[in-house]
Swiss-Prot record:
Protein name: GMP synthase [glutamine-hydrolyzing] subunit B
Residues annotated for ATP binding in this entry: S27, G28, G29, V30, D31, S32, S33
HAMAP family: GMP_synthase_B
Broadest EC class assigned to this enzyme: ligase
Coiled coil: none
Gene it is expressed from: guaAB
Domain GMPS ATP-PPase, first and last residues per copy: 1-184
One Pfam family, short name: GMP_synt_C
Length: 307
């Protein structure tokens, strides 16, 4: 099945782009990664993949994306480290909605600057079926590059728009993408910035990045397959004991949920010893953290992410 689909899409992209150039915002998530590899098969180096490091990525993510797509797949990859710019723009901002808006705006500004330099004719997006079906036929813009086609006068190509998430995962596997990509858990567009409650600073993101990595490692080691598993820095300090003295440290919440589509979700019944190991590692490996909590709330009433 996938051989025909790949052949058809490669032909379609090749014919549409012609001698022109195309650009894609590559996040390292399964949708954009699959669309990028598919388009690269069609037009080679005339596809410019842009990876923007916002500073809110998972541990080792920028290095992994560069190694996978530039070194292994041979993509024409533009790596942009805009982390300082993002942190500067978010200084003093604590409102979750405001944070999301700023991150979206800065991302578009950065992507737009690169797109102008490249002078591309087409924008390739990893839009999938639920993105536009959920919004009743009106295409829901990708949170990062919404509005860009019109602003930059780019023609839009969406090779995955008729596929569902499980199909995209199958296609990614068929295209030779590593399991770390095709089986990865969903990750919020604004990244770790929405897993830091309150102001987003490099120091606070560093704490949640480490905690997040520990949660993912231990859940994987235990052989569990949740929809999502992550850590959140609550921005609440509590009293603890360090040796003979009282210590005043940060609190981290751990969230592990099961879901079919992310629309509803149940808190996972994670074995007690796994939770204890996570708590032990977070408090012993991250000196700033003194307390770990487990969130047992379903969706609804809570959302999966905290912000």
């Amino acid at each position: 099945m996938w051989e025909n689909f790949i052949e058809e899409k490669v032909k379609e992209i090749r014919e549409t782009v012609g001698d022109g150039k195309a650009i894609i915002a590559l996040s390292g998530g399964v949708d954009s990664s699959t669309a990028a590899v598919l388009a690269h098969r069609a037009i080679g180096d005339r596809l410019h993949a842009v990876f923007v490091n916002t500073g809110f990525m998972r541990k080792g993510e920028p290095e992994f994306v560069v190694k996978t797509f530039r070194d292994e797949f041979g993509l024409n990859l533009h790596y942009v480290d805009a982390s300082e710019r993002f942190f500067r723009e978010l200084k003093g901002v604590t409102d979750p909605e405001e944070k999301r808006k700023i991150i979206g705006r800065v991302f578009i500004e950065v992507f737009e600057e690169v797109a102008k330099e490249i002078n591309a004719d087409f924008l390739i997006q990893g839009t999938i079926a639920p993105d536009w079906i959920e919004s009743h036929g009106k295409i829901k813009s990708h949170h990062n590059v919404g509005g860009l086609p019109e602003r930059l006068n780019l023609k839009l190509i969406e090779p995955l728009r008729d596929l569902y998430k499980d199909e995209v995962r199958e296609l990614a596997k068929e295209l030779g993408l590593p399991e770390k990509i095709y089986n990865r858990m969903p990750f919020p567009g604004p990244g770790l910035a929405v897993r830091v409650l309150g102001e987003v600073t490099p120091e606070r993101v560093a704490i949640v990045r480490e905690a997040n990595a520990i949660v993912e490692e231990e859940i994987e080691k235990a052989g569990l397959k949740p929809w999502q598993a992550f850590a959140v820095l609550l921005g609440v300090k509590t009293v603890g004991v360090q040796g003979d003295i009282r210590a005043y440290k940060e609190t981290v919440a751990v969230r592990v949920v099961e879901s079919l589509d992310g629309m509803t979700a149940n808190a996972m019944n994670v074995p007690w010893e796994v939770l204890q190991r996570i708590a032990f590692r977070i408090t012993s490996e991250i000196p700033e953290v003194g307390r770990v909590l487990y969130d047992i709330t379903n969706k609804p009433p809570a959302t999966i992410e905290f912000e």
